[in-house]
Amino acid sequence: MTQVFGENGELIPVTVVEAKENVVLQKKTVEVDGYNAIQVGFEDKKAYKKDAKSNKYANKPAEGHAKKADAAPKRFIREFRNVDVDAYEVGQEVSVDTFVAGDVIDVTGVSKGKGFQGAIKRHGQSRGPMSHGSHFHRAPGSVGMASDASRVFKGQKMPGRMGGNTVTVQNLEVVQVDTENKVILVKGNVPGPKKGLVEIRTSIKKGNK
């Protein structure tokens, strides 16, 4: 994150989101596919290489799919529904000028992985007394009943893997759009680590496009 100053001198914390090489690979229509959507690819993959075991290399189907759009195979491919399909053409680059300052957007990403964590950190549960003969401190309490249920109910909040989930932060404001460097400055923070992949959509609650 960084910060910029508004017109009135107010300090605004922003996240810099880079948006390069977004190419429309396919258009889907109600007549052919049953719904309207555009398929967008991001970040080039290496060309097909026989017997390549790394996923950095594209396979033959991926190369053929991208060739229809006269583009290189892409590492990330996503679909966006509820858009004006007629406003896009296959092979067209979707640039940052799709958004302008003041737009309200939803940002989706994969949250930071925290590894295996206890119930206190993972679910915000309270710990036990730390002194005076306490037999539990950060351990979880009762997780079920005795003979009546004779099992632990599904969904019980227990220790486990934390983070690494798909998270959407809604109603974030676009502070600035830099078309020269192809970056968007978003007010506040977005899900995921640095250099993580995020999807930016028009706000579903406060849509403006």
UniProtKB/Swiss-Prot annotation:
Pfam families cross-referenced by the UniProt entry: Ribosomal_L3 (PF00297)
Keyword Methyltransferase on entry: no
GO molecular function: rRNA binding; structural constituent of ribosome
Region (Disordered): 119-145
Alphabetized InterPro entries for the sequence: Ribosomal_uL3 (IPR000597), Ribosomal_uL3_bac/org-type (IPR019927), Ribosomal_uL3_CS (IPR019926), Transl_B-barrel_sf (IPR009000)
GO-annotated biological processes: translation
Keyword list, A-Z: Ribonucleoprotein, Ribosomal protein, RNA-binding, rRNA-binding
GO cellular component, one term: cytosolic large ribosomal subunit
Domain of life from the UniProt record: Bacteria
Family matches, as Gene3D superfamilies: 3.30.160.810, Translation factors
Family classification: Belongs to the universal ribosomal protein uL3 family.
Quaternary structure (record): Part of the 50S ribosomal subunit. Forms a cluster with proteins L14 and L19.
PANTHER family: 50S RIBOSOMAL PROTEIN L3, LARGE RIBOSOMAL SUBUNIT PROTEIN UL3C
Function statement: One of the primary rRNA binding proteins, it binds directly near the 3'-end of the 23S rRNA, where it nucleates assembly of the 50S subunit.
Name of the protein this chain belongs to: Large ribosomal subunit protein uL3
Organism of provenance: Staphylococcus aureus (strain COL)
